């Protein structure tokens, strides 16, 4: 993948520290970002070192492991973790309305409204995944994808993280949902989506991130 370009025209593999190029919102101050980078460097007073790993289960989507870790105070600890390739979601906005997928989430036991999204294939560039899922679930095609953020939803036990993009230059096509995928596509005002999030009706993190990014860029 080194040297290849993604849909943003940017080299792949720069997930950590991406700054929302492709026409994104203004970045924070250089001094502020340097301070945050310093805070995120490994600190021997806090780091847990993996000294053993046990395979529990390998599934189609994720892998479960138990880890033995050496703690900073010299004792050992036990962690249960889930390894996952991660995913990508895309916020598509047209005339102040954002495209959402309406579907049933059996793990939550409820209906859900979410931006189009899907799992990364091994080694896949997130922008490529975002383009694929947008086309499959909604039929929409975008001229470019602007990186917004990478969100780790359950950082305490899994490495799963979702890259969120804004789609620009939309055109309509034909949806091609995966076999066994039953969804409706709806367009809702961006600010209504945020109101629904505050009311606890929309709980999906990547969707909330996408809506906030749309407001930040005056797309709502």
Per-segment meaning from a language model:
Residues 2, 21-23, 29-34, 40, ...:
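Conserved Nudix-box catalytic region and its N-terminal flanking loop in Nudix hydrolases
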Residues 48-89, 94:
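Acidic, metal-coordinating catalytic segment for phosphate/diphosphate chemistry
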Residues 59, 107, 154-157:
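Short glycine/serine/proline-enriched coil/turn segments at secondary-structure junctions
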Residues 77, 88-89, 94, 119-205:
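Unchanged
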Residues 214-220:
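Short helix-capping/linker segments at secondary-structure and domain boundaries
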């Amino acid at each position: 993948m080194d040297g290849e370009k993604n849909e943003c025209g940017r080299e792949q593999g720069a997930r950590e520290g991406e700054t929302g190029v492709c026409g994104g919102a203004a970045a924070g101050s250089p001094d502020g970002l340097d301070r945050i980078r310093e805070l995120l460097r490994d600190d021997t007073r806090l780091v847990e070192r993996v000294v053993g790993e046990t395979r529990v289960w390998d599934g189609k989507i994720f892998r479960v492991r138990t880890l033995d870790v050496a703690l900073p105070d010299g004792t050992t600890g036990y962690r249960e973790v889930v390894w996952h390739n991660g995913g990508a979601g895309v916020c598509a906005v047209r005339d102040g309305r954002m495209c959402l997928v309406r579907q049933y989430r059996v793990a939550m036991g409820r209906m859900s409204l979410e931006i189009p999204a899907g799992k990364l294939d091994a080694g896949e560039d997130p922008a490529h995944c975002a383009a694929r899922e947008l086309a499959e679930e909604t039929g929409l095609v975008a001229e470019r994808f602007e990186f917004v953020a990478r969100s780790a939803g359950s950082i305490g036990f899994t490495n799963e993280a979702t890259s969120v993009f804004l789609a620009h230059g939309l055109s309509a096509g034909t949806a091609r949902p995966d076999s066994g995928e039953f969804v409706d596509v709806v367009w809702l005002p961006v600010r209504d989506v945020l109101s629904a999030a505050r009311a606890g009706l929309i709980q999906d993190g990547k969707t909330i991130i996408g809506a906030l990014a749309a407001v930040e860029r005056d797309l709502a």
